[in-house]
Amino acid sequence: MSALSARDVDVVYSGKGGRSVTALSNVSLTIESGEFVVAVGASGCGKTTLLKLFAGFLPPSSGAITLGGKPVRGPGGERGVVFQDDALFPWLSVRGNIEFGPRLAGLDSAERKQRCGRIIDLVGLAEFADHRIWELSGGMRQRVGMARALANEPEILLMDEPLGALDALTREKMQELLIRLWDRTRRSVFLITHSVEEAIFLATRIVVLSPRPGRITREFHTDFSRRVLAGESSRSIKSDPAFIALREQVLAAVLKGADA
């Protein structure tokens, strides 16, 4: 799988009264194959802007976005996007939503059903495959959103606060599911969140962005997700003194930028 990179990227918007607003400044970040990278930072620091650059929804004002060394000039099937708002089609079933992308891509019926059936099992929705979207809970809808992104077999998943709207119990279960999906599919992941605890739990690498203009100020490497895969409970991991110590370090880095 290919590395997704931002190199010396600036994003400048036109603000009120003709004034320019710099959302990101001199940002360089490479997501290597198999990594789970999580971005944190204060509101307005440019996390979502960076994700939009990677997705091809937004061009940089300067610098370059590349995938496997080739310029990213727009959205593409090699990058799957999952939003906080699941953006599902309410008139379709779970299966219909998940099969939508492969159907649009022209995948033949037998292969489409086999691929999507496997993904439906992977996200734990086999019993609900023929349910309509409006019949599902928030957590189940997000499972459908993740499955729909995976159905196109992207090289990397780009996730914009996918668990932000969920209650605490559902969110923790979904964090565990995300780790299992990452492990089993071997996809790279770039996720943004406001939760430092969530970042530490999920990531192999955390990047901290400063307030606007957003710059990457710190990076932290972590591997608590491996303990989830080994069968340790979320509560045990999150109460570990090493986890708590890292949480304080990351939070201090976020707050240092916000207070500057």
Where are the model-predicted features located?
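A short, flexible loop at the N-terminus of ABC-type nucleotide-binding domains that lies
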Residues: 1-3, 12-26
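The feature captures the beta-strand-to-loop junction immediately N-terminal to the Walker
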Residues: 40-42
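Helix-to-loop junction immediately C-terminal to a conserved catalytic motif
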Residues: 55
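Conserved ABC transporter NBD signature motif
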Residues: 63-75, 115
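Short coil-to-helix segment of the ABC ATPase nucleotide-binding domain corresponding to the Q-loop/switch region
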Residues: 92-100
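Conserved ABC ATPase "signature" region
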Residues: 103, 110-128, 180
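Conserved signature/switch motifs of ABC ATPase nucleotide-binding domains
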Residues: 131-134, 152
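Hydrophobic anchor residue at the start of the ABC signature
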Residues: 146
